[in-house]
Amino acid sequence: METIINPRILLLLLSSVIMALVIMFVPPVSQDPGYHNFADQRNISGIPHFWNVVTNIPFLVLGITGFFKIQKQELTGILPDFFRAYLAFFMGLVLTGLGSGYYHLDPSNLALVGDRMAITVTFMSFFVLIFGESISTRTASRLLLPLLFLGLASVVYWNITENLGTGDLRFYALVQFLPMLLIPLMLLFYGSCLSGRRWILAIILVYVVAKIAEMYDQQIYELIGFSGHSLKHLIAAFGAFLFLKGVEVRKPIK
């Protein structure tokens, strides 16, 4: 698992380069002001946008639970070399719960900065963990801090460009969606040094369903009285729950 001298790595590199080039040649995309106009605007118990706020609580619970379980170092489904990456993932969940909850109290570009920073911490940590169990633990452990920096930098860059009146989401889009392209490729072309790969496959599927729910925010709200965006929070939290269960039951492959 420690070597990446394999022709299949070229597919990952080529995919990364192609997507980066595509993003580079796409005109800058600013944040749509309508993005903040979510379907469920209800104020309940004095809390504005109640369900979009409180559906972030599972992220807090799962993040705190996972953080302390990882610190005990009693879980079988973790790679010892990646202790910091697991901690970063679960801390990212905690920050996502806080950042998203705060954002939904009064949605704005400024509040969205913290939300997106937290999400990038979770995304980059998850990507590093999958890279490590699939390709190279040594290389992945070296990637954690640079990728976290790039993720946070993408949000800072977007915020600066928005403040300058020339909003540019391209860098952030690359950071968010490139891992979602590369992870399935790693699952398809590489094995794992941990058992139970189906846990990761389930997490990817759940993430896709969550994004679909987000896309149909208004339609789902009109259909069931509960918005697609709030449902997205719960579905994504279920994905985090699957990850936590995975690190409890997966085992190293000798």
Positions of predicted regions on the chain:
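Extracellular-loop-to-transmembrane junctions of the mid-late helices
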Residues: 158-186
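Early transmembrane hairpin module of multi-pass membrane proteins
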Residues: 2-147, 153-165, 189, 194-253
